[in-house]
């Protein structure tokens, strides 16, 4: 297989991994620490990720517990969670901040499915752009007489097959996440 196709395949695999990573931040009805990945807290004069100022655990299926290393960090942590837009209300007992994950409403679940579909489409476009870049490179190689016309058509076909494989992976991951979001 051509170096160009191998590189294209690697870039597509990275896109699928990035897609999975993005989807892990989409909230479902279950507690997941990854929904807090993007939250930053103002601590000691600088901005720090939430997981660097507290220990995050899941004591129950619908609860996340945050235990700050410094109890003075509880108010900034609560403030950061409220500002995050996740719709979570922190409850603190002076030592631990608890986040109860509420049951998602039907409307909220439908909105989240739309969000998943939108993210999936963005990554499909990214994968197709990678294919286009690879085909452009192959056409340049043909123009420079590095490959023959027959090789060009065969490699374009290989590029399309690889693209189809990664788009299918993306669709499977997307369908799985949509199903997870719609579970009551």
UniProtKB/Swiss-Prot annotation:
Transmembrane segments: none annotated. Gene3D superfamilies: 3.30.1360.40, Ribosome-recycling factor. Keywords: Cytoplasm, Protein biosynthesis. It is found in: Cytoplasm. InterPro entries: Ribosome_recyc_fac, Ribosome_recyc_fac_dom, RRF_sf. Coiled coil: none annotated. GO terms for molecular function: ribosomal large subunit binding. The keyword Coiled coil does not apply. Responsible for the release of ribosomes from messenger RNA at the termination of protein biosynthesis. May increase the efficiency of translation by recycling ribosomes from one round of translation to another. Belongs to the RRF family. This is Ribosome-recycling factor. It comes from Desulfotalea psychrophila (strain LSv54 / DSM 12343). The lineage of its organism: Bacteria, Pseudomonadati, Thermodesulfobacteriota, Desulfobulbia, Desulfobulbales.
């Amino acid at each position: 297989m051509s170096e160009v196709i191998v590189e294209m395949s690697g870039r597509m695999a990275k896109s699928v991994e990035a897609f999975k990573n993005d989807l892990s931040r989409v909230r479902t009805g279950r507690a997941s620490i990854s929904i807090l990945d993007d939250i930053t807290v103002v601590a000691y004069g600088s901005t720090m990720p939430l997981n660097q100022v507290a220990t995050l655990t899941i004591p129950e299926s619908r609860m996340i517990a945050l235990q700050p290393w410094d109890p003075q960090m509880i108010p900034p942590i609560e403030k950061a969670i409220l500002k995050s837009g996740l719709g979570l209300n922190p409850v603190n007992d002076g030592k631990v901040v608890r986040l109860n994950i509420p049951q998602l409403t039907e409307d909220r679940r439908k909105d989240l499915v739309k969000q998943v579909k939108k993210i999936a489409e963005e990554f499909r476009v990214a994968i197709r752009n990678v294919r286009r870049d690879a085909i452009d490179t192959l056409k340049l190689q043909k123009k420079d007489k590095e490959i023959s016309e027959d090789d060009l058509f065969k490699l374009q076909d290989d590029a399309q097959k690889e693209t189809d494989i990664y788009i299918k992976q993306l669709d499977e991951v997307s369908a799985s996440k949509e199903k997870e979001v719609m579970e009551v």
